[in-house]
């Protein structure tokens, strides 16, 4: 009987493989695919922006935490994160490293360097967080997070995209409306192709849902509208709270001009802006200049206006200079950058909020209006078709298209107490609809929570 000759190297290989299988199955595979998997449901929430000034994503984090999920909140930490995030034991904040580059921020070379740096940082974070059940990203931006998130699905992680707007439309605005600019085209292609691979989709308006379903081919059964709603920190003043007393609070006291008196009818308005082309603050400044001139030349009964402009962004210094160079007589304009906990306190003290958001896509709604409604203040908003899903003219706000119309709205708003009373009631009614109930309803529709 002849024996089959088997090389000893094969025998050794088979024995080593056989002995290694338990190690591979029980240690290596879990290490690669599961990492530090939690016994709780675990979700990664990505913010390619400052976490402290990304309220909707922070609200998501808190809502998932309240359901007992482990939340890994990833993003830039430029300012202090909100207390309700920092103090929540179910939420861990993972700071993305920042890259400081000099040069033209619109150049292709600059953008490529920035994207490559972000890709390496995000991949490194996702490796550490492998084993998560879900990943929630906001869009925009789509580059580079959307393709990375889609490929991350190969680990078994389900992807949720929260469509705040369309990234390509914002890029198109930055590049002077040129849809065929390479960056704009790349953004459009990435959204169009990779957006289809999400397990679930959330949108901020019905109009955006319709667009994504009809133009991007998203599954309507896996796409749900989740309107922005104010969180609990945005609330109207109660009857027992004195507005005059609160105006003497440390965070605002030094910003109240001498001789300005709300008890004598002076008015406070506020706008929040990122100083970008889709929020033209020159409309507000121009309207306030006309208002100031109206007081001097036409109507001495007009109340003084104190206007707070909150936020920061690339075009801020230009507007600050414009305001400083004007000889104001009856209007005060203050540019402020507030802590996240002070912004709701400021809104409570205002008579009106002003929204300058134009919407690059025409499909989104500004979160700032919801914060204003949550604080019980009516809104004067730049008008575009989708705005009607939120702002009802002469019910909870007023609308305008240019500085002249905004000036007229300011005149009506400042002088007509009956109009203010009516709009105030509409805003207070809107303030009763809160984030938690809207979030719960949307997540139940997607069968993500019970």
Curated annotation (Swiss-Prot):
Keywords, sorted A to Z: Endoplasmic reticulum, Glycosyltransferase, Membrane, Signal-anchor, Transferase, Transmembrane, Transmembrane helix
Topology, Cytoplasmic side: 35-106, 128-450
Main location: endoplasmic reticulum
Catalysis performed (reactions): an N,N'-diacetylchitobiosyl-diphospho-di-trans,poly-cis-dolichol + GDP-alpha-D-mannose = a beta-D-Man-(1->4)-beta-D-GlcNAc-(1->4)-alpha-D-GlcNAc-diphospho-di-trans,poly-cis-dolichol + GDP + H(+)
Biological process according to GO: dolichol-linked oligosaccharide biosynthetic process
Enzyme superclass (EC): transferase
Membrane topology: Single-pass membrane protein
SUPFAM superfamilies: UDP-Glycosyltransferase/glycogen phosphorylase
GO CC annotation terms, alphabetical: cytoplasmic side of endoplasmic reticulum membrane
Similarity comment: family membership: Belongs to the glycosyltransferase group 1 family.
Full protein name: Chitobiosyldiphosphodolichol beta-mannosyltransferase
Protein's organism: Candida glabrata (strain ATCC 2001 / BCRC 20586 / JCM 3761 / NBRC 0622 / NRRL Y-65 / CBS 138)
């Amino acid at each position: 009987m002849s024996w089959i000759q088997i090389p000893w190297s094969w025998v050794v290989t088979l024995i080593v493989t056989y002995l290694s299988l338990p190690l591979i199955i029980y240690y290596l595979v879990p290490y690669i695919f599961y990492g530090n998997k939690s016994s709780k449901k675990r979700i990664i929430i990505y913010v390619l922006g400052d976490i402290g000034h990304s309220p909707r994503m922070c609200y998501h984090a808190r809502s998932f935490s309240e359901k007992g999920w482990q939340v890994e909140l990833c993003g830039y930490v430029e300012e202090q994160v909100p207390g309700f995030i920092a103090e929540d034991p179910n939420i861990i904040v993972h700071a993305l490293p920042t890259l400081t580059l000099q040069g033209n921020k619109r150049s292709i070379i600059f953008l490529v360097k920035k994207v490559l740096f972000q890709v390496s940082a995000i991949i490194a974070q996702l490796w550490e967080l492998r084993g998560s059940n879900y990943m929630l990203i906001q869009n925009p931006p789509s580059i580079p997070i959307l393709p990375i998130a889609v490929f991350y699905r190969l680990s078994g992680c389900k992807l949720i995209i929260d469509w705040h707007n369309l990234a390509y439309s914002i890029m198109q605005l930055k590049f002077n409306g040129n849809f065929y600019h390479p960056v704009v085209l790349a953004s459009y292609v990435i959204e169009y192709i990779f957006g289809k691979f999400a397990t679930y989709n959330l949108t901020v308006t019905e109009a955006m849902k319709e667009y994504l379903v009809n133009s991007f081919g998203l599954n309507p059964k896996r796409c749900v509208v989740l309107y922005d709603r104010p969180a609990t920190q945005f609330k109207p003043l109660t009857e027992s709270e004195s507005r005059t007393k609160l105006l003497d609070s440390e965070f605002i006291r030094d910003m109240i001009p001498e001789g300005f008196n709300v008890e004598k009818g002076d008015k406070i308005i506020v706008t929040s802006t990122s100083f970008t082309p889709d929020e033209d603050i020159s409309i507000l400044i121009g309207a306030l200049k006309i208002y100031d001139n109206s007081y001097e030349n036409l109507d001495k009964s007009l109340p003084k206006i104190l206007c707070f402009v909150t936020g920061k962004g690339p075009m801020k210094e230009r507007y600050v200079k414009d305001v400083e160079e004007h000889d104001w007589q009856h209007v005060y304009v203050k540019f402020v950058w507030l802590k996240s906990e002070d912004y709701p306190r400021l809104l409570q003290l205002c008579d009106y909020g002003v929204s300058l958001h134009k919407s690059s896509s025409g499909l989104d709604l500004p979160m700032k209006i919801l914060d204003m409604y949550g604080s019980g203040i009516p809104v004067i908003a730049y008008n575009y078709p989708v705005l009607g899903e939120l702002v009802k003219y002469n019910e909870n706000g007023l609308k305008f298209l240019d500085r002249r119309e905004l000036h007229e709205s300011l005149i009506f708003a400042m002088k007509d107490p009956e109009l203010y009373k009516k709009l105030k009631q509409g805003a207070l009614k809107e303030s009763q609809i809160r984030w938690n109930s809207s979030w719960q309803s949307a997540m139940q529709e997607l069968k993500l929570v019970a």
